[in-house]
């Protein structure tokens, strides 16, 4: 896959790569925390607000469905306004959302309405962080930076998992949302202080929109299965007889593994000259085995399945976003928003399908279907890679013709 040579600025006056990456992690974690906290608290929420696994799947699905609708327009806004302002808007919005959930979620309908009203916060937080990294981090550190940034997703599930035994089972789920709101406000201190200058503009034909759309579709399938993992793991473990506190710790274990592997993916990406999308496809194929193990009875299978599913089946987003940004340095937020449409669409459909399967056929059947879907996403990712390679060849040949004229 062809990559751009100057995706980030190397201005010596710019903040350090470490500080930029840390800020991106904090902003992304705060932005995505509301939905994953809802999944981790699902046992307590369902008891108080009277809904079943399909109801949980519906609320999460609608959340990501609204996110999919917001992705492209929010991407345009982030490109025009800059990450300094939009990152602050995102974390304040997430804080307001969690405070509203703590105080106003008195019924299932109220839970749904509140989450949908705040879905745009996740989109803006993700895209503003992508823009910050693309314009502030040197090219030779960008892979690791995106790996660190995407570690925010398992970091959010880590916080959500810890909230179950530490808060939800002691003082209640409303306090867990309240603490989440305070943490989101604290994220304001990590937001970027300035907007880095954009890279030089390239022609619109350089964006490889068709290839990005195919990769977005593959990402949608993978994201649908991965979203179900973060949302339904605790409920699934409790259903097989695991103590709720231990089930929350299983989510924590998976989050730590996923966080570590995402950073490893990024570090290794900086040492390669290409092949990033192929690595994503291989990770998805291997992660399918972890989902199959989640369908197998017994605690050992659960532990190994959690490690594989989080470590391989859900460790690819940072590497994929890195590849997309390298290909589209002049409009990183807009380019990643194309892929994010697929990701959010998968987040919309995945929980609905999984929740329905879990309700009518049981969790083992739902995890098995997830494994098959992840294999299909790996194959589609390879198709998108072939399209990217073909686009890169056409662009190279066009450049040669222009230089020879």
Give names to the regions the model predicted.
Residues 275-320:
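C-terminal transmembrane helical hairpin of 12-TM major facilitator-type secondary transporters
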Residues 114-152:
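Cytoplasmic helix-loop-helix junction between adjacent transmembrane helices
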Residues 110, 148-192:
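Helix-loop-helix hairpin linking two adjacent transmembrane segments in secondary transporters
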Residues 36, 64-72, 157-158, 255-263, ...:
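Residue-level signature of mid-helix packing/kink "hotspots" within the transmembrane helices
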Residues 330-363, 370:
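A late C-terminal transmembrane helix in Major Facilitator Superfamily
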């Amino acid at each position: 896959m062809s990559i751009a040579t100057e995706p980030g600025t190397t201005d010596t006056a710019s903040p350090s790569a470490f500080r930029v990456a840390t800020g991106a992690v904090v902003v992304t974690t705060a932005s995505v925390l509301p939905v994953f906290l809802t999944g981790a608290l699902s046992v307590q929420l369902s008891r108080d607000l009277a809904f079943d696994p399909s109801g949980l799947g519906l609320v999460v699905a609608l959340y990501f469905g609204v996110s999919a609708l917001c992705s492209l327009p929010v991407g345009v806004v982030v490109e025009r306004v800059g990450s300094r302002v939009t990152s602050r808007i995102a974390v304040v919005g997430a804080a307001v959302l969690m405070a509203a959930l703590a105080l106003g979620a008195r019924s299932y309908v109220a839970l749904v309405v509140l989450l949908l009203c705040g879905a745009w916060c996740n989109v803006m937080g993700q895209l503003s962080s992508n823009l910050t990294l693309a314009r502030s981090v040197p090219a030779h550190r960008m892979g690791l930076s995106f790996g660190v940034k995407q570690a925010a997703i398992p970091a959010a599930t880590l916080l959500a998992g810890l909230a179950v035994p530490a808060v939800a089972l002691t003082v209640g789920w409303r306090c867990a949302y309240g603490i989440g709101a305070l943490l989101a406000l604290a994220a304001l201190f990590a937001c970027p202080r300035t907007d880095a200058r954009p890279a030089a503009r390239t022609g619109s034909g350089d964006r490889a929109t068709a290839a990005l759309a195919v990769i977005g579709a593959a990402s949608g399938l993978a994201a649908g299965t991965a979203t179900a993992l973060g949302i339904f793991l605790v409920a699934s473990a409790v259903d097989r007889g695991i103590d709720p506190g231990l089930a929350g710790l299983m989510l924590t274990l998976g989050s730590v593994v996923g966080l570590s592997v995402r950073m490893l993916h990024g570090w290794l990406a900086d040492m390669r000259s290409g092949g990033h999308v192929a690595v994503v496809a291989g990770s998805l194929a291997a992660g399918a085995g972890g989902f199959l193990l989640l369908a197998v009875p017994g605690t050992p299978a659960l532990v190994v399945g959690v490690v594989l599913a989080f470590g391989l089946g859900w460790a690819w987003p940072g590497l994929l976003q890195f590849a997309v940004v390298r290909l589209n340095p002049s409009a990183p937020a807009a380019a990643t928003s194309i892929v994010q449409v697929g990701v959010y669409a998968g987040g919309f459909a995945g929980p609905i399908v999984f929740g329905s399967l879990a309700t009518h056929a049981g969790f083992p059947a739902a995890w098995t279907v997830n494994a098959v879907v992840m294999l299909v996403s790996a194959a589609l990712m390879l198709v998108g890679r072939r399209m990217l390679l073909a686009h890169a060849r056409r662009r190279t040949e066009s450049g040669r013709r222009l230089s020879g004229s």
